[in-house]
Amino acid sequence: MRNNNFVRVAVATAVAAIIFVTGSAAQAAPGKTLQAFASEREISDLFKRWAEETRRREGESRSMQGFQDSAAMGALSSAAQPAAKAAEAAADSITNVQHAGVDEGGIVKRHGDTLVILRRGRLFTVKVGGDELAPVSVADAFGSGVSPHGAWYDEMLISGSTIAVIGYSYERGGTEIGLFEISDSGRLRYRETYHLRSNDYYSSRNYASRLIGSKLVFYTPLYLNPFAGDPWGSFPAFRRWRPGVTAAEFKPIAPATRIYRTDEPLDPWQGVALHTVTVCDLAKPQLNCESTAVMGAPGRVFYVSGGSVYVWTTQGRRNRAALAAASGSAVFRIPLDGAAPTALKVAGSPIDQFSFLEGADNHLNVLVRSDGRGDGMWAAERNAGDFALLRVSLDSFSDGKDSAPAESYKALPRPSGHAVQNRYVGSYLMYGVGAGWNRAQRTLYSQVYAVRYADDSKAHEIPLAHGVDRIEPLGANAVVIGSDGRDLHFTSVRLAATPSVQDRYTRLNAAQGETRSHGFYYKPDSDNAGFVGLPIVGGGRAGSRQLRENSAAVLFLRNQSLRLTELGALDSRPEANANDGCRASCVDWYGNSRPIFVNNRVFALMGYEIVEGRLSGNQLAEVQRVSFSPVTVSLAR
């Protein structure tokens, strides 16, 4: 195991904090939080100092061009409701979410007896009540009077009868929230569109939006440029769209007293971002949003629990000397109830949102790599360095002056490869390496690691005959899914005192058709049994081809006490050479295929098709299908 470098960095970070700050994270005074700016004048003065410093450096090197290139690359690459409401939403959910009660923006949602699908710049509804399977309504996802040019409409969430479509506009330079109303019969009505200032939120793995009760929660980065004529033109703001709307109509939603910082010196030469969490209440007649922002380094991974957003920041990749000397990383805890954020200095970077777990034991657990890159754009698909598990008490978060102690990092084995998958299942953290967005290579031997995150036990190496492209819970146990370069394997793992493989199902000449977490779904029907659904394609297809190609089928398996058996697959029959008149979002960045379970009915969404299967004994057979493509169906608007 090559762990020493990681531990050295963690020790150096902790020692530096002790030298410069009285106390340590283990002794953090309760109630200490990050410091907010006192006024807009204080922020303006900071921008002036940054601009003067960068101009000084410009005389020593080509710093101005370097900053502008870095900022451009950064922009391109880079309060819970009552438990009853959360439980009701979870029961109606058809989405494979990380946290129960925290819905995630996706391409298909359920509203009673109606499925709502977001695809290629349009919203569609399909009725599934009783034995129905019938298209009902369609609407442009960008709403009336809004140009779709340069916009991507990626995610959707539903609260009550309100549908929120989340997009990003390069033309208008910000996140868009399109609000629609849906009737009990599935009819759609456009309501209004709002804009939030932000840089592109896209991540190949993470989702920009969450829904907790009626609260719509966003994480968005804002990369700062001290040379802008009006620095406040880059700060969080919000406006309602109308024809002829101007930039002057943006209303600030994060005053200076809601913008926070640590004692860590920030250098615009290396990049600075406002890591912004915005909460909007969809239950109110008119949308109002409030933001909290933390000023920090540009690299980021974020994770949403039931009550907080965690944002892990890392220095820009140009600052390798600084990274070698110290951590260059921090993790911020931003409460959703509007309370002041807290922070902790840390080392390394998580892989993606699944690297985090806020446990019921009041601890935060995070899998990190010493040379991680965050999860902006495709950064999560390629990271490097040693592995460690960070485990800290939530009480150790304070004003950001303290570091996580070196003993809070547990060095872990380092598998070979860059496309890391990780997941917390029961009392274990599991991780391994697969093909990611690349074509899977021929694999005869691989492994997945499992470690109890709450104690000092060693990591268990579990041998596999395939790579690790997906790790998913099967109740208290897990299934590891991956390719050997030709075939697709589903390996069930019992997470007992000593984790062990229980069974393996192999689908010949196949690969998974979706890499995102929402592509998989497990529907339990008891503690030890349930149904697995996953889109598949022919063996050897690279994961990146999911952007423009539908899955060939959705495969369904039965789990019975970790024995996996095939029930059948529902196949796709796409229309040949059909032109759907796409005007926006004409690449499936979030995929296009999902397994769907509604009550006792089983569906496969594949592009513009929904296919229903019926289980008879141990066989799943197709009973009906429908196309909701705008080419073949005339839908009422």
Please provide the spans of the model-predicted regions.
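Initiator methionine at the very start of the polypeptide chain
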Residues: 1-2, 27
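Bacterial N-terminal signal peptides that target proteins for export
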Residues: 2-11
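Bacterial N-terminal signal peptides
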Residues: 10-21
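Beta-sheet-rich non-transmembrane sensory/scaffold domains
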Residues: 27-637
